[in-house]
């Protein structure tokens, strides 16, 4: 029986996502023996500093990529929003699965919406993109960094450390925690991270056998949408150091891409959106990035450099 080993982080959410990929692979190839290879990453272990301060979201990938290079794993499963815009050789995105809910969720045990939070309420999120949008809509809020797995973050809310926190809807749904969502923060008013809600599988470019197996998981509409989002972010030189949001969707007549660049310090947001009848997400991504730059995003990006 052929064997496929999936490198994964050890968190409950990462394990759920990897088990989901494994189950899909077993359905596609019933004679395939799929096993998980759980491991810790530096991004999971260093929780007292922001991701921007310790090197960015690539810290969630490094150990998993090393496992593939050593021959200890054949592929790795990630939340696509955590995958750097440019994967260095010899790695590639072998599959992007059908997207789950791309929105963020406001979670509070007392208040029912972002608007109903009291003046000066304490809201926690580690994402600069979320902080910038919170600052835009509610400049009075006190914002705090919050890292750790989903249950750790919920526990801090439940302990009274904060009045509300912001998490990704997809992660909550995958863990069966939909009931904790107080309000969805969703497009067009609120934009997610590029690729948010999608699961990605990374493999070695040179491994054609694994690449062929994983290609059966790929959802082409999702891949095209996230290509547009990630191309926009790449054109802006975006990273976890920069508050960038993007969301692409198929509508009658073609693909629509909405993008924003924000500033946490003063809550400024620069927005742009375009529709394209051509099925070329990379061109649309570059076009929206240029619109953002023309509208003043260059100044905000320079402030974060």
Curated annotation (Swiss-Prot):
Cofactor note: Binds 1 dipyrromethane group covalently.
Residue numbers carrying S-(dipyrrolylmethanemethyl)cysteine: 240
GO CC annotation: cytoplasm
Record bears the keyword Zinc: no
PROSITE patterns noted in UniProt: PORPHOBILINOGEN_DEAM
Keywords on record: Porphyrin biosynthesis, Transferase
GO molecular function: hydroxymethylbilane synthase activity
InterPro entries associated with the record: HemC, Porphobilin_deaminase_cofac_BS, Porphobilin_deaminase_N, Porphobilinogen_deaminase_C, Porphobilinogen_deaminase_C_sf
Cofactor(s) the protein needs: dipyrromethane
Pfam families in alphabetical order: Porphobil_deam (PF01379), Porphobil_deamC (PF03900)
Family: Belongs to the HMBS family.
Extra facts: The porphobilinogen subunits are added to the dipyrromethane group.
Function of the molecule: Tetrapolymerization of the monopyrrole PBG into the hydroxymethylbilane pre-uroporphyrinogen in several discrete steps.
PANTHER family given in the database record: PORPHOBILINOGEN DEAMINASE
Protein name: Porphobilinogen deaminase
Organism: Xylella fastidiosa (strain Temecula1 / ATCC 700964)
């Amino acid at each position: 029986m052929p064997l496929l080993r999936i490198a994964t982080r050890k968190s409950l959410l990462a394990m759920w996502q990897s088990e989901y990929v494994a189950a899909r692979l077993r359905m596609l190839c019933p004679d395939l023996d799929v096993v998980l290879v759980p491991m810790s990453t530096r991004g999971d272990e260093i929780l007292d500093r922001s991701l921007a301060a310790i090197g960015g979201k690539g810290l969630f990938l490094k150990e998993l990529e090393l496992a593939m290079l050593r021959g200890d794993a054949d592929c790795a499963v990630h939340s696509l929003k955590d995958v750097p815009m440019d994967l260095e050789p010899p790695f590639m995105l072998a599959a992007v699965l059908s997207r789950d809910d791309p929105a963020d969720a406001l979670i509070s045990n007392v208040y029912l919406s972002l608007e109903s939070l009291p003046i000066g309420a304490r809201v926690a999120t580690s994402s600069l993109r979320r902080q910038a949008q919170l600052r835009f809509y509610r400049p009075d809020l006190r914002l705090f960094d919050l890292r750790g797995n989903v249950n750790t973050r919920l526990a801090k809310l439940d302990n009274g450390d904060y009045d509300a926190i912001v998490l990704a809807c997809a992660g909550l749904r995958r863990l069966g925690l939909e009931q904790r969502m107080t309000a969805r923060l969703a497009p067009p008013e609120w934009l997610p991270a590029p690729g948010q809600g999608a699961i990605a599988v990374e493999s070695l470019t040179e491994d054609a056998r694994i690449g062929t197996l994983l290609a059966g998981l790929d959802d082409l509409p999702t891949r095209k949408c996230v290509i547009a989002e990630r191309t926009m972010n790449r054109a802006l030189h975006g990273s976890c150091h920069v508050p960038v949001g993007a969301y692409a969707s198929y509508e009658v007549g073609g693909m629509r891409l909405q993008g924003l660049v924000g500033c946490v310090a003063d809550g400024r947001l620069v927005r742009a959106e375009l529709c394209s009848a051509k099925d070329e997400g990379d061109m649309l991504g570059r076009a929206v990035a240029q619109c953002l730059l023309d509208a003043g995003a260059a100044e905000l990006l320079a402030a974060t450099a």
